[in-house]
Amino acid sequence: MNLMTTITGVVLAGGKARRMGGVDKGLLELNGKPLWQHVADALMTQLSHVVVNANRHQEIYQASGLKVIEDSLADYPGPLAGMLSVMQQEAGEWFLFCPCDTPYIPPDLAARLNHQRKDAPVVWVHDGERDHPTIALVNRAIEPLLLEYLQAGERRVMVFMRLAGGHAVDFSDHKDAFVNVNTPEELARWQEKR
């Protein structure tokens, strides 16, 4: 599979950011650049087509020139709704999803997930300690199952990934690459570190 052309990269920036006081997390700056832009830039070094899933401030995301896709389900019920919306509105068979608050994803993310997926329709990152199911390579074949799952009122990402027949891929050698920003204090610590 030619990764550059067969996988669509997706920055998931559609969340409500409750732990950040409702601030659009993707627009918070790290070293002078919005968090979501760090993720998009990292994906663009690996893939030729990248889009953004966002439910607020679309005009800011659109100013980048990237296509912005809003959730098709009411009330923006979490990252799975963003994944479904992108699959409903984008062509292609494979999608690499990454949350907007993971600015240090590794440069071999797409290649490693693809190489180690075997025949699974879904694979996600495991950093050696915990799963990161929203950093996932997903095949379009799971779209009907995902729609059914969401229509049943389910929202749990990890439960769905396993239900869809997926497995984790070990990235314990890149553990720090998957730390995400959930509070203003964490963002401040990152500003100091990097």
Swiss-Prot record:
Keyword Magnesium: yes
A single GO BP: bis(molybdopterin guanine dinucleotide)molybdenum biosynthetic process
Annotated catalysed reactions: Mo-molybdopterin + GTP + H(+) = Mo-molybdopterin guanine dinucleotide + diphosphate
Positions annotated to bind GTP: L12, A13, G14, K25, N53, D71, D101
Domain free text: The N-terminal domain determines nucleotide recognition and specific binding, while the C-terminal domain determines the specific binding to the target protein. When the N-terminal domain of MobA is fused to the C-terminal domain of MocA, comparable kinetic constants as wild-type MobA are obtained with GTP, and the activity with CTP is completely lost. Consistent results are obtained when the N-terminal domain of MocA is fused to the C-terminal domain of MobA: the kinetic constants with CTP are comparable with the ones found for wild-type MocA, although no activity with GTP is detected.
Subcellular location, principal: cytoplasm
Organism ancestry: Bacteria, Pseudomonadati, Pseudomonadota, Gammaproteobacteria, Enterobacterales
Subcellular localization: Cytoplasm
Organism the protein comes from: Escherichia coli (strain K12)
Annotated protein name in UniProt: Molybdenum cofactor guanylyltransferase
SUPFAM superfamilies: Nucleotide-diphospho-sugar transferases
Family: Belongs to the MobA family.
Reported function: Transfers a GMP moiety from GTP to Mo-molybdopterin (Mo-MPT) cofactor (Moco or molybdenum cofactor) to form Mo-molybdopterin guanine dinucleotide (Mo-MGD) cofactor. Is also involved in the biosynthesis of the bis-MGD form of the Moco cofactor (Mo-bisMGD) in which the metal is symmetrically ligated by the dithiolene groups of two MGD molecules. Is necessary and sufficient for the in vitro activation of the DMSOR molybdoenzyme that uses the Mo-bisMGD form of molybdenum cofactor, which implies formation and efficient insertion of the cofactor into the enzyme without the need of a chaperone.
Key words of the record: Cytoplasm, GTP-binding, Magnesium, Manganese, Metal-binding, Molybdenum cofactor biosynthesis, Nucleotide-binding, Transferase
Annotated cofactor note: Both divalent cations appear to be equally efficient in an vitro reconstitution assay.
Gene: mobA
Cofactor(s) needed: Mg(2+); Mn(2+)
GO terms under cellular component: cytoplasm
